[in-house]
């Protein structure tokens, strides 16, 4: 019974809640203390990812005196700051490198059936945006906030061959592999 309860609470911490078609993921909750004259003041921070599973994703960072309020604030903030990402049938268009601070990420498209091979904060972002097959590696700092920012930066900088061809005024066939 106790094992079942601990398993449920462990699953609930990273559970995706789907309402209005959005995937919500809790990446990290942190307790922060501030020392004042009367002792310590504790506050909580929450880092969350919100996505629609079809190329739209946002992240939020909320702070409050209680955990549920911090999570709610971060979810609202994430919904306000959504950005669109161009995907290629559930994977990336091309390999991507990005960094934020000391956190670097490398993401590579993968064939169908591979799944999301990524760790921690990167996995949450990739699943929320709707990537089904990808190989990803975090290099350097494993700070969740910087990893999320680096992953989003890499996804936002990725461009489809159609977009690149349009920008250069060329035909998409000019970019085919092997020529």
Swiss-Prot record:
InterPro entries: Ribosomal_Su5_D2-typ_SF, Ribosomal_uS5, Ribosomal_uS5_bac-type, Ribosomal_uS5_C, Ribosomal_uS5_N, Ribosomal_uS5_N_CS, Ribsml_uS5_D2-typ_fold_subgr. Pfam families: Ribosomal_S5, Ribosomal_S5_C. One of its GO terms (molecular function) is rRNA binding. The keyword Heme does not apply. Keywords: Ribonucleoprotein, Ribosomal protein, RNA-binding, rRNA-binding. GO terms for biological process: translation. The keyword Manganese does not apply. GO terms for cellular component: small ribosomal subunit. Residues 22-85 form the S5 DRBM domain. Part of the 30S ribosomal subunit. Contacts proteins S4 and S8. With S4 and S12 plays an important role in translational accuracy. Located at the back of the 30S subunit body where it stabilizes the conformation of the head with respect to the body. Belongs to the universal ribosomal protein uS5 family. The N-terminal domain interacts with the head of the 30S subunit; the C-terminal domain interacts with the body and contacts protein S4. The interaction surface between S4 and S5 is involved in control of translational fidelity. HAMAP family: Ribosomal_uS5_B. This is Small ribosomal subunit protein uS5. It comes from Xylella fastidiosa (strain Temecula1 / ATCC 700964). The gene is rpsE.
């Amino acid at each position: 019974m106790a094992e079942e309860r601990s398993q449920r609470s462990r699953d609930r911490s990273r559970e995706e809640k789907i309402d209005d078609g959005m995937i919500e993921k809790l990446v990290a909750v942190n307790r922060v203390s501030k020392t004042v004259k009367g002792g310590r003041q504790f506050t909580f921070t929450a880092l969350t990812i919100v996505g629609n599973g079809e190329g739209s994703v946002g992240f939020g960072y909320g702070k409050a005196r209680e955990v549920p309020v911090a999570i709610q604030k971060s979810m609202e903030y994430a919904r306000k700051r959504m950005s669109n990402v161009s995907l290629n049938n559930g994977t990336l268009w091309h390999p991507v490198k990005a960094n934020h601070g000391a956190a670097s990420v490398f993401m590579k498209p993968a064939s169908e059936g591979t799944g999301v091979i990524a760790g921690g904060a990167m996995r949450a972002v990739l699943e929320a945006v709707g990537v089904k097959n990808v190989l990803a590696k975090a290099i350097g700092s494993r700070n969740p906030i910087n990893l999320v920012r680096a992953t989003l930066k890499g996804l936002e900088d990725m461009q489809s061959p159609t977009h690149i061809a349009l920008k250069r005024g060329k035909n998409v066939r000019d970019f085919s592999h092997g020529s």
